[in-house]
Amino acid sequence: MAERKYFGTDGVRGKVGQFPITPDFALKLGWAAGKILATQGTKQVLIGKDTRISGYMLESALEAGLAAAGLSAAFVGPMPTPAIAYLTRTFRAEAGIVISASHNPYYDNGIKFFSSVGEKLPDEVEEAIEALLDQPMDCVESAQLGKAMRINDAAGRYIEFCKGTFPANASLKGYKIVVDCANGATYHIAPNVMRELGAEVIEIGTKPDGLNINEKCGATDIKALQKVVVESGADVGLAYDGDGDRIMMVDHLGNKVDGDQILFIIAREALRSGKLHGGVVGTLMSNMGLEVALKHLAIPFTRANVGDRYVLEQLKEKGWKLGGENSGHIIVLDKNTTGDGIIASLEVLAAMEAHKMSLNDLARAVPLFPQVLINVRFEGGKNPLESDAVKAVAADVEKRLAGRGRILLRKSGTEPLIRVMVECEDGALAQSCAEEIVEAVKSN
């Protein structure tokens, strides 16, 4: 694969107003994508966004670029990332474009693409788009220019899709649910899904103003959700991130239920119903407690590199259907083609309803191991992880933790940092082992 100049692992992302998140680059990107995507099909591209104020600027620029290349744009407004994947498929569009920086602050934004089947664009297509970005723009004949339209019922379509994944003979009547939408793209979707399934819903983080996305709310900051759940006597709390592809949950006692626990609950329920389709894909950061709990059920488990993109790659490689990250990216491939926070939360709620069990009871089946994370800054160009002394200490720690824990040492890709992670069923042992490795890293 050729080295990328503009596209990262999750499209193009950065600070608004600084290259590449500028209106002129978005215009050129729309044009380049349009030139590559133009086929004999409908020549239509869906464009969705989260609630950042910069989304207006970027969608207009993208639309102009697409039109110059002869493709029409269909705007769906603020919609979750997984909704764009779904709608791109159902509208038979050439592609879908999402304008979002996910869980980042409002002053960041990004642009990523879905293929016509709602999956990440193939590498060769991204490379072809990149190659065109360095060429001068041209414009199709006036009669061939693209148009723009707005799809007014996109939210309703996606709400119905989400509800359709919930068991037809079940409902959420009698449940009190607090829904935190991070002032992001799920603000007009998730509360309505839960209400229409019968739940009593308390909303927080559903008043976006363009600047407050992910601000002290949502999947990356659940303190407000925990407080409201406990004070209101709710059964469960749901926290989505800015673009709706992550989910964190809170039980009735205010305890956090993370992606690893959510993944286990969904896997166990799929096993019981005969719909597991193989095993489960986690990541290098998935808690060992998840691995142990799945092993007790004889469910195969494998680890991908950190990032939902790599989880998806492993799922496809193995032909499995379920994977995710402890950060709350949960992929259920027989429901949607990408991580979907609303779908994942409905899977857990369906398990709660089927067994008349609280989230606390369901999550208790995954006793998470204490995890110690320490970042160690290093000087100079040499990677301390290549030191024989560090390797020897790491090997000794691994031997002591055998069967009871594990270590993960990673060099940051963006900073001169070594990330030391140790987890063990004995928290004190995890802490002492981590400190031992840190000292070795600092000394080399």
Curated annotation (Swiss-Prot):
Activated by phosphorylation. Mg(2+) binds at S102, D241, D243, D245. The active site is at S102. One of its GO terms (biological process) is UDP-N-acetylglucosamine biosynthetic process. GO terms for cellular component: cytosol. Its EC number is 5.4.2.10. Binds 1 Mg(2+) ion per subunit. Transmembrane segments: none annotated. It catalyses: alpha-D-glucosamine 1-phosphate = D-glucosamine 6-phosphate. It comes from the Bacteria. This is Phosphoglucosamine mutase. It comes from Actinobacillus pleuropneumoniae serotype 7 (strain AP76).
